[in-house]
Design a protein with these regions (language model features):
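Hydrophobic beta-strand scaffold residues
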Residues: 58, 84, 164-165, 226
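Conserved beta-alpha-beta core of the PfkB/ribokinase-like small-molecule kinase fold
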Residues: 134-214, 233-234
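Short beta-strand scaffold segments in enzyme catalytic cores
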Residues: 49, 93-97, 105, 234-237
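Glycine-rich phosphate/adenosyl-contacting loop at the front of the ribokinase-like
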Residues: 1-61, 68-72, 254, 319-320
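Structural alpha-helical scaffold elements that stabilize or flank donor/cofactor-binding regions
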Residues: 127-128, 185-186, 219
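Conserved phosphate-binding/catalytic region of the ribokinase-like
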Residues: 1-7, 32, 156, 206-320
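Conserved phosphate-binding/catalytic loop of the ribokinase/pfkB sugar-kinase fold
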Residues: 96-148
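A glycine-rich helix N-cap at a beta->alpha junction
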Residues: 76-91
Length: 320
């Protein structure tokens, strides 16, 4: 199959992951943490790395800052097939703290991601190589200028022949009525909606997951899929009224950062191979578990997890 059938558009940044931390330290003190890693990250970056671990290839479209951190980040991402615009801004930095309970807290600077715009992105968009090609949009709330053009971007991607997958991630500004309406417009326009259970419940404004799904599913266009990532429990999906669920395998995990992004990689690679909903959910869960079970992530080489890929012939169509 063509090498650029999966494109990822969204946020990349420099991540420092530290932990575990049992309780919040007193102001003005220093705390020693047992484990840590410096790595390239962001939702789009994590997904691109996961594709590489699975032996696949994706074209990553993003931006970096014009400082030393940006140069380092470019060096980490370009081997993945990244097309990166250097913008006049400091590189976005994230510190992720892993709590002893397994939850995470993130501190992120706006940095270069605030400058990422549709005008920067548009020259890198090419016609889809076939009618099954997919673009994953990730990390929208950290890219406000690009977010403002999301309706235009989604229309443009469809005009170029792509199917569109969307993972919004969590909004730092939290959910408001206006934001819910904005996201509902995106959901109704794309082919794959990939959210976690908290995002689903928050977007629907209901704490009951089943009720939240029932509220969101009617927003989907015909043939589109709503995927709900439920963390260690696995994932479920709804497509044209049919529901499928897959339970994740239990695993001992220190750092769950990028679990949802890794799921997206496994799920979308399976879809590109022609897999149905159930098989794609299983592939996503397997990818997520395998990636986050490894720490540090630099211990995973490209192709190390290729055994998890769904592989079956899929007939290629003429682009729409």
């Amino acid at each position: 199959m063509g090498e650029d059938r999966l494109t990822i558009i969204g946020d990349v940044g420099v991540d420092v992951v530290l932990g575990p931390i049992a309780e919040w330290p007193r102001v003005g003190t220093e705390t020693l943490l047992e484990r840590g890693e410096l790595r390239a990250g962001g939702a789009a970056g994590n997904a691109a790395f996961a594709v590489s671990y699975l032996g696949g290839h994706a074209r990553l479209l993003s931006v970096v800052g014009n400082d030393e951190s940006g140069a380092w980040l470019s060096g980490q991402l370009r081997p993945l097939g990244a097309s990166l615009v250097v913008c006049d801004a400091p590189t976005t930095l994230t510190v992720g703290l892993i709590h002893s309970c397994g939850e995470r807290t993130f501190f992120t600077t706006p940095g270069h991601l605030e400058a990422f715009s549709y005008e920067m992105l548009r020259p890198s968009l090419a016609p889809a190589p076939d009618a099954n090609a997919i673009v994953l949009l990730a990390g929208v709330f950290l890219t406000p200028a690009l977010r403002a053009a999301y309706p235009l971007l989604i229309r443009e991607l469809h005009a170029l022949g792509y199917l569109v997958a969307l993972d919004t991630n969590w909004p730092p500004q939290d959910w408001s009525a206006a934001l819910r309406d904005e996201v509902a417009g995106w959901i109704s326009a794309v082919e794959h909606v990939l959210l976690n259970d908290l995002e689903i419940r928050s977007l629907a404004g209901n704490d009951d997951l089943a009720t939240a799904i029932d509220r969101l599913a009617p927003m989907l266009k015909s043939g589109a899929t709503l995927v709900v990532k439920t963390g260690p429990r696995g994932a479920l999906g709804i497509q044209d009224g049919r529901r499928s669920e897959h339970a994740a395998q239990p695993a001992s995990i220190f750092d769950t950062t990028g679990a949802g992004d890794s799921f997206n990689a496994g799920y979308l690679l399976a879809r590109l191979e022609g897999a149905g909903l159930a098989e794609s959910l299983a592939a996503g869960c397997a990818a997520a578990t395998a990636v986050i079970a490894r720490f540090p992530r630099r211990s995973i080489a490209a192709g190390d997890l290729a055994r998890l890929r769904v592989r079956q012939p899929v007939p290629l169509e003429t682009p729409r």
